Every structure is written in structure tokens, then in C-alpha cells.
């Protein structure tokens, strides 16, 4: 099994703390930036930052599955680990530019399937997920008024 990785990055004209505060809000803010690939989104525990547990159904590229993620945060990095698989999503927000903006990266990694299916997964899943993540970052920018 090879590790599969996908990511998208966008610079925003918004301070890092404002971006992080938005991303920590799993009840009100986070659902606003999800694409139609995410359904049955719910907060199971907490709702703000560290310790929050969320669930959703994700469908893309002819595949569907359920996720149950636990939020962890350290040094401006918000990580969400799936209880049901090796999937991890990571939001990294760092200062960018001279005007107090931010660079926001949404990344995912997981253990890919073995065999020929794993080869195709490693080639095509990152492309599709990168497109979806770019849309999420566009929605984040719009939600933050940039």
C-alpha cells in the first residue's frame, strides 16, 4: 500500500488568526465551505476546534464512503483524523505577503489500495481531490470576504 496525497493552496488577504477561527467553527462556518461532494455532515462532539468530532458522507469519482473525523490542533495546523480509516486531512495556515494575509493549504493523505486498483487510485484520486479542495478554498475565500 502506497501513501496517497493530495493538496491545494490559496493565498487570502485575511489574517491567519481570522482564517483559523473560521476553520475551528465546525457548527456554523465549516458547513458553508463544503462542496456537494459532502453530505450528511454532522457535529457529533464539541463543535469548536480541538476535540471536535464530525462525520459526513463523501462521494467523488464513482466512490463513496463515510468518515468520522477528530480534530486536533497545534501551532496553526488543524488536523482531522478519520476513526474509520487511515485518512487524515490537514489545514495549514501561515502568514503570507507583507499585508497580513495568509497562505492556506488543505491536504489529505491515506493508505492507498494494493494492486492495480491502488495504481489507479494513486494517479486519479489526487487529481479529483485537488479540484474539490480548490473549490473549498474558493468558498473559504468568499466566506471570509476576499
Give, region by region, the residue ranges found by the protein language model:
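Hydrophobic-ligand binding "helix-grip"
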Residues: 31, 57-105, 109-111, 143
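Positively charged, low-complexity intrinsically disordered regions
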Residues: 11, 51, 64-66
Amino acid at each position: 500500500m502506497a501513501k496517497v496525497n493530495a493538496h491545494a493552496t490559496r493565498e487570502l488577504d485575511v489574517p491567519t488568526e481570522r482564517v483559523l477561527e473560521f476553520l475551528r467553527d465546525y457548527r456554523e462556518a465549516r458547513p458553508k465551505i463544503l462542496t456537494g461532494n459532502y453530505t450528511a455532515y454532522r457535529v457529533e462532539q464539541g463543535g469548536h476546534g480541538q476535540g471536535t468530532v464530525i462525520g459526513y458522507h463523501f462521494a467523488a469519482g464513482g466512490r463513496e464512503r463515510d468518515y468520522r473525523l477528530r480534530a486536533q490542533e497545534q501551532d496553526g495546523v488543524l488536523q482531522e483524523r478519520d476513526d474509520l480509516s487511515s485518512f487524515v486531512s490537514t489545514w495549514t495556515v501561515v502568514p503570507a505577503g507583507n499585508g497580513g494575509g495568509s497562505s492556506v493549504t488543505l491536504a489529505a493523505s491515506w493508505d492507498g489500495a494494493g494492486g492495480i486498483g491502488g495504481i489507479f487510485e494513486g494517479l486519479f484520486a489526487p487529481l479529483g481531490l485537488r479540484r474539490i479542495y480548490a473549490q473549498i478554498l474558493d468558498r473559504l475565500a468568499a466566506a471570509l470576504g476576499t
